[in-house]
Amino acid sequence: MSRTSLTRFLIQEQHAGRINADLRQLIAVVARACTSISIAVSKGALGGVLGDAGTGNVQGEAQKKLDVISNEILLEANAWGGHLAACASEEMDHSQPVPDIYPRGDFLLLFDPLDGSSNIDVNVSVGTIFSVLRCPTNVELPGDDAFLQPGSKQIAAGYCIYGPSTQLVLTVGHGTHAFTLDREKGEFVLTTENMQIPAATQEFAINMSNQRHWEAPMQAYVGDLLAGKEGTRGKNFNMRWIASMVADVHRILTRGGIFIYPWDKKDPSKAGKLRLMYEANPMGLLVEQAGGAAWTGRERILDIQPDQLHQRVPVFLGSREEVAEAVRYHHAHDNAQG
């Protein structure tokens, strides 16, 4: 029996009235760009792409060579197709409208070109995360303000993970689906339809080295996880941590769990570590479409009205019952504080 290619899947979604032709073509372009990034990543040291680029991004983080390469691949692939009005990237200070020499479309594309790139030199899975919004009407030349929409306004989101196989995980608002790159044919093929995250879990993913910086409800919540069967939770938990959001979330979409990157006092000026627009929103939509939940610990991520392009937030996402439990600890603490 023949498998369904990404192209066929998108055409079927268009015929069902769930996406239009422009969105179909935009997603196809992003997928092709991810294929190019996958090739660059897989060459590793042979391609001379490892190591630092000697530059920094708007967040003050050192850029890897592959950060810069991946960003350029996505920008160049999407500039001329006529589907986009503007792009925004974690690696750029401001959004970038489509050049005047090309036609402008109705969509805005946001992306983290290479999430987890600090792991690339040690051959750990990394990935590309992307989100699609509609450009506000009557905006001729969209700037940063055009992107400041809550995650609930996303019309598509996805990520591509570059691991033992390259997989594209995608939602257009009707379930979350996984496609695997067939390298011989050069196309993505549907391998898991309607991914579902188990409601309950006994796995959590968190960087425990930051424990001393956490606020009280986080200390209590994780303390009860570690207490296991002898504690108030009455069951044992396993901890997993890859330090690559794409890899950690992919595991959760595949077999369940909760991914946590809370606010901490290590840098109290920042509201969290992860970026709302490039990481939390697209991953939140993918997880919710797979039956999971995505919160900051106190509010649903997709409800947040952003006030800046590179805004950061705490993130709790994955199995919905466990996310609800973590939220309960935070609300109980806040209520006790009055």
From Swiss-Prot:
Gene Ontology terms for molecular function? fructose 1,6-bisphosphate 1-phosphatase activity; magnesium ion binding
GO-annotated biological processes: fructose 1,6-bisphosphate metabolic process; fructose 6-phosphate metabolic process; fructose metabolic process; gluconeogenesis; sucrose biosynthetic process
Comment on bound cofactor: Binds 2 magnesium ions per subunit.
Q: What positions does the entry give for substrate binding?
A: 115-118, 207, 273
* Enzyme Commission number(s) from the entry: 3.1.3.11
UniProt binding sites for Mg(2+) 2: 112, 115, 279
Q: How does it assemble?
A: Homotetramer.
- The protein's enzyme class: hydrolase
Q: What does it catalyze?
A: beta-D-fructose 1,6-bisphosphate + H2O = beta-D-fructose 6-phosphate + phosphate
Where is this chain's protein located in or outside the cell?
Cytoplasm
Per the record, the pathway is: Carbohydrate biosynthesis; gluconeogenesis
* This protein's name: Fructose-1,6-bisphosphatase class 1
Can you tell me which residues bind Mg(2+) 1?
90, 112, 114
Record carries keyword Cytoplasm = yes
| Cofactor dependence | Mg(2+)
